[in-house]
Amino acid sequence: MADGLHRVHYNPSTAQLVEFALLRGEGELTANGALVAKTGARSGRSPGDRFIVKEPSSEADIEWGPVNQAFEPGAFEGLWARVEAYLADKELFVSDLEVGADTEHYQPVRVTTQYAWHQLFARNLFIIPEEFNRKDKPVWQIINAPDFVCDPARDGTNSDAAVILNFAERKVLLAGLKYAGEMKKSMFSVQNFLLPAQGVLPMHCSANVGKDGDTTLFFGLSGTGKTTLSADPKRFLIGDDEHGWAPGGVFNIEGGCYAKCIDLSQKNEPVIWDAIRFGTVLENVVMDEHRVPNYKDSSLTENTRAAYPLEHIAQRKEDKCGAEPHAVVFLTCDVSGVLPPVSILTKEQAAYHFLSGYTAKVGSTEIGSTSAIQSTFSTCFGAPFFPRPAGVYAELLMKRIESFGSQVYLVNTGWTGGPHGVGKRFDIPTTRAIVDAIVSGELKDVETIHLDTLNLAVPVAVTGVDSNLLNPINTWGDKALYAEYAQKLAEAFTKNFAKYQVSDAIRHAGPKA
């Protein structure tokens, strides 16, 4: 469709976007029909280049700091205008989409991209509504101009690229970045700011539902198992990464999945494997000479990705919504090999571990990270995406758990028998067996043992799991060394938690240093 002096393609179809991407040299087709695109040096998020405009309507509610860096309103206006001028004579792709599957809590967003494959990504990951903006809400705007080069001296940025959120003007600007994940995480941050004011808990989690309508949530950082474990052939997928929990139910914030591809196999992850086909975007995946994706190849990045719409998954919840969850799973990847494979948490322990967000960066999604696996504390299991103070989200979680009676579990998808490099990682079948026991209700009111240093209750038996694995000390050859590592981990928890202003009941729910 012609628009002024240049071409603007409104609400283009998947086939059109794939065709444009190929014609414009943006990507290549794989043997399985997916489109491969490369992002260059920035093959992950750029947290050092993410800003929020500091303006009166939101200033008091944002936790400013290294995660939420402030940007001046005047500088934003100038940069937005420069990017618009830069795009004025370019071929562009535009879609009217929504973020949030709930009819009350959605946000309408117009996405404008310079690249066809970025538009395909947006249409895969956001929601394509039957009727756009049926409640006539003010519309958000995303502009994504990957070939625009920021000038820190002129633009007030930290580098040649920037991601800037403006809550007052409902604008998201992405400039100088090809990594498509920045688009989805920007709108996630927007909803993470807006939803608490509506009494809704936004969550960095996946969700699925059983045949009887029982919902399970899986919280966790990238690479800890959210996508893999929620893609369960026995259950229906609601979503793999971002959800809202309102009184009465949960809803997907997105319309698609952004699955990690490194070491992907048909045997271990059949649902994801089958979803990668025509219309899917593969980011930084290497192909062989026959165009067959090599999912073991991390030469471009550990953070290889597949972006596909939920419609690529046969067993999905059509409306992207579910009942309130009976089971909530916190996925932690423990590199010290100390935590048990599953623990049953009280509501105070749930708040403690939600605020702590102890886990590891596995094949990190951030640029500049090596393939080395490092332990980290990431508040709410997603610190980079939550603009408000952590206590706001923890209070909402406690409220929802209490009002519905959800049971929370801590599941370690990391190491046992020793730290990373010495012990071995729990295999996917073991973790799946634990999750099966959780969703079936098997672990409610079971006999447990108490691990004193970690202050955790561990079931003595889980169907399909070697009972020797359940108490982690059993898997260590050197029991004294295990006790030493457990004490070190408890001290790390205590030190990290000191910054939170919480009740004694929550503070005492953590490990005992």
Curated annotation (Swiss-Prot):
What cellular-component terms does GO give this entry? cytosol
Main location class: cytoplasm
Q: Which UniProt keywords apply?
A: ATP-binding, Cytoplasm, Decarboxylase, Gluconeogenesis, Lyase, Manganese, Metal-binding, Nucleotide-binding
Summarize where substrate binds, as residue positions.
R45, Y179, K185, R305
Could you mention a single GO BP entry for this protein?
gluconeogenesis
Q: Which pathway is this protein engaged in?
A: Carbohydrate biosynthesis; gluconeogenesis
List the subcellular locations: Cytoplasm
Q: What residue intervals traverse the membrane?
A: none
Q: What is its EC number?
A: 4.1.1.49
Any note on cofactor binding?
Answer: Binds 1 Mn(2+) ion per subunit.
Query: What is an example of a GO molecular function annotated in this UniProt entry?
Result: phosphoenolpyruvate carboxykinase (ATP) activity
Q: Which residues bind Mn(2+)?
A: K185, H204, D241
Q: What does this protein do?
A: Involved in the gluconeogenesis. Catalyzes the conversion of oxaloacetate (OAA) to phosphoenolpyruvate (PEP) through direct phosphoryl transfer between the nucleoside triphosphate and OAA.
Keyword Manganese tagged: yes
Q: Which family does it belong to?
A: Belongs to the phosphoenolpyruvate carboxykinase (ATP) family.
Q: How does the annotation summarize its subunit structure?
A: Monomer.
User: What is the designated name of this protein?
Assistant: Phosphoenolpyruvate carboxykinase (ATP)
The record lists ATP as bound by: K185, H204, G220, L221, S222, G223, T224, G225, K226, T227, T228, E269, R305, T431
> What are the names of the required cofactors?
Mn(2+)
Organism of provenance: Shewanella putrefaciens (strain CN-32 / ATCC BAA-453)
Q: Which reaction does it catalyse?
A: oxaloacetate + ATP = phosphoenolpyruvate + ADP + CO2
